[in-house]
């Protein structure tokens, strides 16, 4: 699963918009949109924010996807 797919799935599970996710993560809507379209991936600091957000919501986010992004591997 790509990072883009994981973010789309996360929003779907939470039933929130790109805007709502952006607000929760303190990032721009454009950033969420670029992630979902596979144009960019988050930096390491933002990955930690995503992890914490998922943990706070008891969401089993695709952490293997996060680890591959951390290592610079692209799916």
Model-derived features with residue positions:
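A short, Lys/Arg-rich alpha-helix, primarily the initiator
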Residues: 1-13, 51
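Residue-level detection of the helix-turn-helix DNA-binding "recognition helix"
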Residues: 8, 12, 26, 37-39
